[in-house]
Amino acid sequence: MTGKNWILISTTTPKSLEDEIVGRLLKILFVIFVDLISIIYVVITS
């Protein structure tokens, strides 16, 4: 199994397709949020 597929597959089985879509969106938003925080931190500390 490749890394990309591992990221897309959630640890729990989604009850419906909508739950799966929401879960993926939340993961994407969380990654973007962490990236923004790290960028802001670098800008402030530089």
From Swiss-Prot:
Its cellular-component GO annotations read: sarcoplasmic reticulum membrane
| UniProt topology in membrane | Single-pass membrane protein
Give residue ranges on the Cytoplasmic side.
1-21
One biological-process term from Gene Ontology?
negative regulation of calcium ion import into sarcoplasmic reticulum
* Claim: Transmembrane is one of the keywords in the record: yes
Q: Where are the transmembrane segments?
A: 22-42
Q: Which domain of life is it from?
A: Eukaryota
Subcellular locations according to the entry: Sarcoplasmic reticulum membrane
* A GO molecular-function descriptor: enzyme inhibitor activity
Q: What does this protein do, in the record's words?
A: Inhibits the activity of ATP2A1/SERCA1 ATPase in sarcoplasmic reticulum by decreasing the apparent affinity of the ATPase for Ca(2+), thereby acting as a key regulator of skeletal muscle activity. Its high expression in adult skeletal muscle, suggests that it constitutes the predominant regulator of ATP2A1/SERCA1 in adult skeletal muscle. Also inhibits the activity of ATP2A2/SERCA2 and ATP2A3/SERCA3.
Q: What is this protein called?
A: Myoregulin
Organism in which the protein naturally occurs: Homo sapiens
The record lists the lineage as:
Eukaryota, Metazoa, Chordata, Craniata, Vertebrata
